[in-house]
Design a protein with these regions (language model features):
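Glycine-centered flexibility sites
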Residues: 81, 117, 121, 219, ...
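Membrane-embedded alpha-helical signal segments
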Residues: 1-271, 275, 279, 286-289, ...
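Hydrophobic alpha-helical transmembrane segments of membrane transport and translocation systems
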Residues: 354-358, 362-447
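Transmembrane alpha-helical segments that form the functional core of multipass membrane systems
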Residues: 237-373, 377-387
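Broad structural signal for hydrophobic residues in well-ordered alpha-helices, predominantly aliphatic
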Residues: 5, 172, 319-320, 392
């Protein structure tokens, strides 16, 4: 009776078909031995099944059992822990009984560590992640909408937002509909849909439950993917990538000082080297003789043009960053850092490749990037912007420096994340915008 069906379903050894009989009615049980909880089924559900309720199991066990006739999604459901009970080759019930093999909740590894805030981090189970958000936000206005991607694996996504602010959900779902990947296992696949051709990141990735909760209360939407321990937040702006989750709870003088420094670090990381190159190459008359003599002394022994010196240092820094990020253990990272310390420093200066002042300024610019943000996409964007400013400054002097700065600010001012300005929200007065940034308050919806 079920031979043809078994031949279609049993494509792998872990898929187990079992024929059995209930009051002379032939039935078939199908489950995955690694994912479906057959022990739970045998101990609790199977003893309660008899001829009187065999065709009403979805009413006997509501929420656990569903009735279906479409065999198209059987393979996907088996991989998610469903157990199938066929009463005929055309009719079946599926029991949602996955084996619980989730890892324990741990601290987020991609967000800055803060001992004064919640240490909860997302895991690879969507239901657990939603429960963690609900633990932080018991507000009835928090709205959760589930969505299934239109791909082969039918990956499950949850959109979490605040009622009255979930007007982005339709646009988000239209973006998700365009995903063509057979199996979406990383949140980066979803981020790519929102990125498009933008030069700056259009989503904020975080695995901190508190970060997501605060963002939702500020009117943003969190996108969670089943199987991923990372959430994406939209819409975003430039300064969202530099904020800490405890900024809203710190004294005004502390938040003002820290955000002033963060803003200064952004300016230094992008513009300091370009300004120095323009000044030295074209406008030495603006410097005193004492300053010029000191600069010449620091560059004594170097044979390469300033542009090449800076390029070599930046390439070495990027080399160590990528080498460290691709290493699998702290032991290897320590070796890379040790070797980097040997290569960059006194040995590089003695070799005549670079000067000490250029090395110092380039190091300050590069480190300032990490003081502003830990978002890898934005770090790369800042690095490319720095090279853009240096190139214009090297060939056109201060005119090139000003042109590059104007072009960068023009691009940021014209960029939007959904309907929100990326750099500056024109609907809010400059005075209020500055006040909101430097003195953040919990519940502020405009950041």
């Amino acid at each position: 009776m079920y031979q043809q069906l078994i031949k279609q379903i049993k494509t792998s050894d872990e898929i187990i078909p079992v024929n059995f009989n209930i009051s002379n009615i032939d039935c078939l049980l199908v489950y995955s031995s690694n994912i479906g909880d057959i022990k739970e089924f045998n101990s609790y559900y199977f003893p309660k099944i008899n001829i009187n309720n065999l065709y009403q199991l979805n009413n006997i066990f509501p929420g656990i059992v569903t009735k279906d006739k479409d065999p198209k999604n059987i393979f996907n459901d088996l991989s998610k822990g469903f157990i199938f009970l066929f009463t005929s080759p055309e009719d079946y019930f599926k029991f949602n009984l996955p084996i619980s093999n989730n890892r324990s909740i741990e601290t987020s590894v991609i967000d800055p560590i803060d001992l004064f805030s919640s240490q909860d981090g997302f895991i690879e189970d969507l239901d657990t992640n939603i429960a963690l958000i609900r633990k932080h936000l018991s507000n009835q206005d928090v709205f959760v909408e589930y969505y299934t991607l239109n791909n082969v694996e039918k990956n499950k996504v949850a959109l979490v937002s605040l009622k009255g602010y979930n007007n982005y959900n339709e646009e988000i779902k239209s973006k998700l509909n365009q995903i063509n990947n057979k199996n979406v296992t990383s949140i980066n696949t979803i981020n790519k849909q929102f990125q498009g051709k933008h030069f700056v990141p259009m989503t904020l990735s975080t695995s901190s439950v508190q970060n997501v909760s605060l963002s939702i209360m500020k009117g943003k939407t969190a996108i969670l993917l089943d199987g991923s321990p990372v959430s994406s937040i939209v819409p975003v702006n430039l300064f969202l990538f530099s904020t800490m989750k405890t900024d809203v709870n710190t004294p005004i003088y502390y938040s003002f000082f820290s955000r002033l420094l963060v803003l200064l670090f952004l300016i230094i990381s992008v513009f300091l080297l370009g300004f120095y190159v323009a000044l030295i190459n074209f406008h030495t008359s603006s410097l005193t003789i004492y300053s010029l003599s000191n600069l010449k002394l620091t560059e004594k022994g170097t044979t390469l043009p300033m542009f090449l010196e800076i390029s070599i240092i930046l390439m070495l820094f990027e080399l160590y960053r990528y080498a460290t990020s691709r290493s699998s253990s702290g032991y290897i990272q320590n070796i890379i850092i040790f070797l980097g310390g040997l290569f960059i420093g006194q040995n590089a200066i003695k070799s005549g490749l670079i000067g000490p002042l250029i090395l110092l300024l380039t190091s300050i610019c590069y480190l300032s990037t990490f003081a502003f943000t830990n978002n890898l996409h934005l770090i790369t964007t800042i690095s490319l912007s720095r090279i853009f400013v240096i190139s214009f400054s090297y060939f056109l002097g201060l005119y090139g420096f000003l042109i590059s700065a104007i072009l960068i600010f023009t691009y940021l001012l014209s960029t939007k994340s959904f309907d929100k300005e990326y750099f500056f929200d024109g609907s809010i007065s400059l005075k209020n915008k500055v006040k909101e940034y430097f003195t953040p308050a919990e519940g502020n919806n405009n950041e």
